Amino acid sequence: ELDTDVLRDYPSILFGLETAFRHLLTGSWALYDTDFSQGKAGIPINGLIWMGDFDTMLSRIEEKMAAGFRCIKLKIGAIGFEDELALLRHIRAHFSSREIELRVDANGAFSPADAMEKLKRLSELELHSIEQPIRAGQWEEMARLAADSPLPIALDEELIGCNTPEGKRKLLSAINPQYIVLKPSLHGGICGGNEWIAEAEKRHIGWWITSALESNIGLNAIAQWCATFD
């Protein structure tokens, strides 16, 4: 039996061992008994697009939509906020919020001083949410944004290093975000992810699961774990 408590501070190793133990238990790459693992059903996923020029981004979005994606995540904070805002407006001019759900990830690019104004401007574009608007570790500032922002906030990097159940409860109660984003290799493996989900749901905080540059073995485990949830 895997001692998950000993490995709490090493989430990537923990996730790898959880996957290996699951493979050993099932004797198959079908790690869970679900319709998805049996090839009978799919799971909804988003398409990821990095910021670029108008034509390139529009082309990429059209490609994603042609492939069946209706939820697109865009990285922001790299090419200048005004340019990124213009690109998002350009996208919305072509695709309504009914046609495509847009999520953005700032990776902590905003400062506490200007974050609220940027969030207000982004909210005008009918976005679903923004991940990590300011860098991690600024709990008071993040809590203020989560309470007052017109655009729902999702925590990502904020969760890294918060590995105990007590720590998870403390963080979620202090910041009270609208969403959390779970990456098993960074946020406690599968067992740690389940703890995050349980604590989030007690507080009516939404959540979703994603990846962090894993191999196909890791992506397989993440996708199959996702499929265990309704």
Regions found by a protein language model. Give the residues of each.
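N-terminal capping/lid subdomain adjacent to the active-site entrance of alpha/beta enzymes
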Residues: 1-102, 107-109, 116, 120-123
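Catalytic core of soluble alpha/beta enzymes
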Residues: 79-226
